[in-house]
Amino acid sequence: MKKTDPDSSRGEWAYGRLKMEIANGTMGPGSRVRENEIAERLSISRTPVREALRRLEAEGLIVHVPHQGAIIAELDHQAVIELYDMRETLEGTAARYAARHASEAEIQDLAELVESEQENVGDFRALAQLNRAFHMALYRAGHNRYLLKALLSLSDAMILLGGTTLAVPDRFPVAHAEHQAIVKAIAERDPDQAEAAARSHIRNAQRARLKLLRAHLVSDFTESAAPAEY
């Protein structure tokens, strides 16, 4: 029987914990990352912390800066534009594929997630989690493993953006209607319309994100592992 390496399991736990802290802003962009302080705070040895930090660095969530050391990565204005531009392309493709390949059960799941959004109006934390679930369900409904991998990589980068764009006034009703349009097109097996609806959704999300960054608004959404709203 193969024995489990305690440091390996602790490293996995530390990785998940630190990623959650980056997502909810506990470790915000630009924050110093000190291995010994994290080990002490999490009450574990430095070995699993080192393993977790290596993984986060490989994902681009931690970077090394001269004269500063390791810090949580920051996305500048151009990086945000590039991130959303790529998401528009990939999510549009995911919606197109979903219209072709999604099962009836997967379409029903998407529809139920959209319905649940309406039941949680005003609860930014719940809405952000539902939004995350909706997009993940959309990615998987496309049934393309390579597209899924690319989208999950972008999803990791999204957690560096901080709070939800639902902090932008009137964003939720628009985003909700956009989700409905995506699901409707997928249910009707209309790849062209599904892609167009998804692309429009991401373009509008990009505008909301840039507005959020310009205004320095702060979301009520805290203490959640869900990445920023799309």
Briefly describe each language-model feature range.
Residues M1-R100, K211-Y230:
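Short linear motifs at protein or domain termini
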Residues R100-T164, A175-A185, Q193-R203, R207:
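Conserved amphipathic alpha-helical segments that form helical-bundle/coiled-coil interaction surfaces
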Residues R171-P173:
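Active-site loop of classical SDR/Rossmann-like NAD(P)-dependent oxidoreductases
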Residues V80-E88, A187, E195, R199:
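Short amphipathic alpha-helical segments with heptad-repeat character
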